[in-house]
Design a protein with these regions (language model features):
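Bacterial N-terminal signal peptides
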Residues: 8-17
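Bacterial N-terminal signal peptides that target proteins for export
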Residues: 1-9
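Extracytoplasmic
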Residues: 24-189
Length: 189
């Protein structure tokens, strides 16, 4: 009985370890939602009336100037192909740039809708920046709202600040994990 229990325990732990390892075939598709809150920043905006991200409402405020750029960031853990879509609402034409390609995307909905941007090749693992800029407001007073990116593909796991993780720590935490080289010699604090 003890041997059977020990064997069953070892097999159970091994199966659990394999299922948590994230191992996948090269052709397996993954999907990840990269939310505005915690993963996006306003990287360009006019000083007179700057746009900003309202974390609580998960929306872009004052997004009515073509100079404003909203940049999403995430990390692809492997190379491969990925399809990017915007979870967005509004009535406008926006420009989406990533991995050396730029696509124009038409937003035409009063409710959040999934709008495909295109398929992109991830040539190597690493951080990916997605810039979104408004080109033309078709209706209303702003370019609308992009609440998240939906990324699908075989580029391995995607790392970003998750919806259940505090955006406070998501925006501030990464700086505590950067490499720091200790100074040589005596140091006085």
């Amino acid at each position: 009985k003890k041997r059977f229990f020990l064997l069953a325990s070892v097999v159970s732990v091994a199966l659990l370890a394999m299922s948590c390892s994230g191992a996948q075939s090269a052709s397996e598709q993954r999907e990840c939602v990269v939310t505005l809150s915690g993963n996006a920043y306003i990287t360009a905006s006019p000083e007179s009336e700057p746009a900003y991200i309202d974390e609580g409402k998960c929306e872009i405020c004052n997004w009515d100037d073509e100079e404003t750029v909203v940049s999403f960031h995430f990390r692809a853990m492997d190379k491969g192909k990925m399809t990017v879509a915007l979870q967005a609402k509004g009535h406008s034409l926006v420009e989406v740039s990533l991995l050396g390609k730029t696509e124009e995307v038409e937003l035409a909905s009063d409710i959040l809708t999934l709008v495909e941007v295109g398929t992109f090749k991830v040539k190597e693992p690493g951080y990916i920046k997605v810039d979104i800029r408004g080109l033309k407001i078709n209706e209303g007073e702003s370019f609308g709202n992009v609440q998240s990116l939906v990324v699908k593909g075989n580029m391995g796991p995607v790392v970003c600040v998750g919806g259940d993780f505090s955006t406070h720590f998501g925006r501030r935490g990464p700086s505590t994990h950067m490499s720091y080289t200790l100074p040589e010699g005596d140091v006085e604090w």
